[in-house]
Amino acid sequence: MDFKYDVIVIGAGHAGCEAAAAAANLGSKTCLITMDMNKVAQMSCNPAVGGIAKGQIVREIDALGGYMGLVTDQTAIQFRILNRSKGPAMWSPRAQCDRNKFIWAWREILENIPNLHIWQDTVKEIIVENGEVVGLKTFWDVTFHARCIVLTAGTFLNGLMHVGKTQLPGGRMAEPASYKLTESIAKHGIEYGRMKTGTPVRIDGRSVHYELMDTQDGECDFHKFSFMNTSVRHLKQLQCWTCFTNEEAHNVLRNGLADSPLFNGQIQSIGPRYCPSIETKIVTFPDKEQHQLFLEPEGETTQELYLNGFSSSLPMEIQIEALKKIPAFKDLVIYRPGYAIEYDYFDPTQLKHTLESKKIKNLFFAGQVNGTTGYEEAGGQGIIAGINAHINCHGGEPFTLARDEAYIGVLIDDLVTKGVDEPYRMFTSRAEYRILLRMDDADMRLTERAYKLGLVKEDRYALLKSKREAVENIVNFTRNYSIKAALINDALENLGTTPLRQGCKLIDLINRPQITIENISEYVPAFKRELDKITDERKEEILEAAEILIKYEGYIGRERIIADKLARLESIKIKGKFDYDSLQSLSTEARQKLKKIDPETIAQASRIPGVSPSDINVLLVLSGR
């Protein structure tokens, strides 16, 4: 065999799969190294994809030509749109997936991508010559040669699991950790630290009293993750269930805190703020009498259930005893206990926006090794790292996404500019341009860029063009079509909105909250005929996109103006221009932070914590602005 590659990806989690697929689809000879081919894209925790802001990231991955959205649609067993009561900037898709089918769907994709080879092994060392990565060595004593390497090792780097006082080395339950690799990277001056995450018990569904729980059903409308997928749901759609903890369960948990690794000093690492363990919840919120739990199926052919909201590293017997105090779990049987895991991560401020290391040329980092948490955040980083690894091999301009282009852009900019002191999770609140970053228009924002890059093929690009044309036709029709008051007022009263005193444009009516494109079209024959011209299977998607553009035109325009103004600061390049230690007009903190991050632009400098507006003014003056 030939062990020489353009790009090697270490780790086949969600970041690694997207990175390897992107590099190979762009034409790089690529190798994906994983410990276990039967665990590619394993959902290590919750068997679900998407959620608030995370769903938008998956849509963006899909718009760029990635696969997470397609695999999710193919293996979803429940689909919902979250935040429907809010505006479209806040809508987020989420799906429960069949855990095992998700793995096999991804594996089928990977095994059929030209230029992509999978190797089952464990990497122990990267090879660096003259400040540039050139290869790696594995525990099978195989030496690989590579022009670029992407590290996507997840929680496996020196992973250590905790259940009560029991500690067990590993990257996941019953899977070995990866040793020596962190140290082989750190010896080249790259800083690293430790983080912690956790997962709940897995329950035997035959022991659950479902009649004592509330049901949570999915939705069966046109929404999906992939812009390519117009088919109905592939798998049988299943229910989830909800219930609450109670004071009896809390007392059991409190009595066990002395044996909790989180509270007895056994775990020193920082865990995810927005996904706390059940023991953290009862300590942080002592007055709260109950906490909601979600019981979620792991697949359509298994009894295994995931208990969302009950992550724990308490001793197994305490976890079981506490759960048995909840009526629905009074006869509880589990497949395995919850556990916590500590792992190594690398400070992401040591990376460029391409996710390439600033210290080792052609070495890229993506996913949980950068201090993030979540499959979606990992996948978003993975596709960007894979694209740029290919570009480093074959030439071209670096591919980055701005904060007004994508949640992926917000994510990466936050990582490389601000760094992390706890596992980073994406929220809509982290994006200052979230009206521009809606779930409905990820294809409009990103697919053309990916097409020019060569990652998006003709079929996807043709779908984008036809959708864009249809949406523009609808919006233009409503702008130009006039309606007389006498002909529409009866309809307006039927729709529960105020009659007109004089004629107006159709777009003005659609801007009313009671009016939608579909309900007003029933009373405007010319508009109905215009909509009937749309024979595309994606008609509902097209109508939704057009309606959002109409109803939120003012907000979108205002945010676009703000983004464009700030974009001017993005054009002022400062990397390598200043000796920050010598700039006494800057604050001490600003000098330290600017020296460490070495920002590319004035705009990036302005987002560094500790760099004040007055510091930015100093840099602008020194830049001749």
UniProtKB/Swiss-Prot annotation:
Pfam families membership: GIDA, GIDA_C_1st, SAM_GIDA_C
Cofactor(s) of this protein: FAD
Entry's Gene Ontology BP terms: tRNA methylation; tRNA wobble uridine modification
Residue numbers binding NAD(+): 271-285
Disulphide linkage map: none
Compartments it resides in: Cytoplasm
InterPro entries: FAD/NAD-bd_sf, GIDA_C_N, MnmG, MnmG-rel, MnmG-rel_CS, MnmG_C, MnmG_C_subdom, MnmG_C_subdom_sf
Residues binding FAD, per UniProt: 11-16, 123, 178, 368
Coiled-coil regions, chain positions: none
SUPFAM superfamilies: FAD/NAD(P)-binding domain
Keywords for the protein's UniProt record, in alphabetical order: Cytoplasm, FAD, Flavoprotein, NAD, tRNA processing
Protein origin, superkingdom: Bacteria
One GO MF term: flavin adenine dinucleotide binding
GO CC, any one term: cytosol
PROSITE patterns tied to this protein: GIDA_1, GIDA_2
Subunit and partners: Homodimer. Heterotetramer of two MnmE and two MnmG subunits.
Similarity comment: family membership: Belongs to the MnmG family.
Its job: NAD-binding protein involved in the addition of a carboxymethylaminomethyl (cmnm) group at the wobble position (U34) of certain tRNAs, forming tRNA-cmnm(5)s(2)U34.
This protein's name: tRNA uridine 5-carboxymethylaminomethyl modification enzyme MnmG
Species this chain originates from: Bacteroides fragilis (strain YCH46)
